A protein has these predicted regions:
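Nucleic acid-binding interface residues in structured DNA/RNA-binding domains
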Residues: 2-135
Length: 135
């Protein structure tokens, strides 16, 4: 397997990530992996290699997202804010949106998991439907 530390075209990938994240409604969350699953692999990259790196690339995109992207709505696969600077702020912002955390600090995706953009929006943007996150 080839090692990719960043997407072949970071700006294009990051922009797609931010477009998706802007679609997440207030009070709902999704994971890095869910977002990655919506974005097709870059040209010339096999799907298996893409699957190995894509969620990390989404994390990288979120670390540099511009103002106005609701970054707090993207959590890790365990249903928690990421372990990084800003995790407490992320939780606070989500709670202000009505997202509840259990005693282990996790969000229940069955309650507030986002099922993804509309099929029309996905088609218009050349994206895949996400696998079920909590649904």
């Amino acid at each position: 397997m080839v090692r990719f530390t960043s997407p072949p075209n970071s700006q294009v990938f990051n922009t797609r990530v931010w477009e998706i994240v802007r679609q997440i409604p207030s009070g709902q969350v999704t994971s890095y992996g869910q977002i990655a699953a919506m974005i097709p692999p870059p040209q010339g990259m096999d799907p298996k290699s893409y699957d190995a790196f894509a969620a990390r690339w989404v994390g990288g995109a979120m670390a540099v997202c511009p103002e106005g992207v609701p970054w707090q709505r993207v959590i890790n696969a365990q249903g928690k804010p990421s372990l990084r600077v800003g995790a407490q702020e992320q939780r606070k912002l989500l709670e202000e949106e009505g997202v509840n955390f259990n005693e282990k600090g996790r969000v229940d995706p069955k309650i507030c998991g986002w099922s993804g953009p509309s099929p029309e929006w996905l088609s218009q943007h050349g994206l895949f439907p996400p696998p079920g996150f909590g649904h």
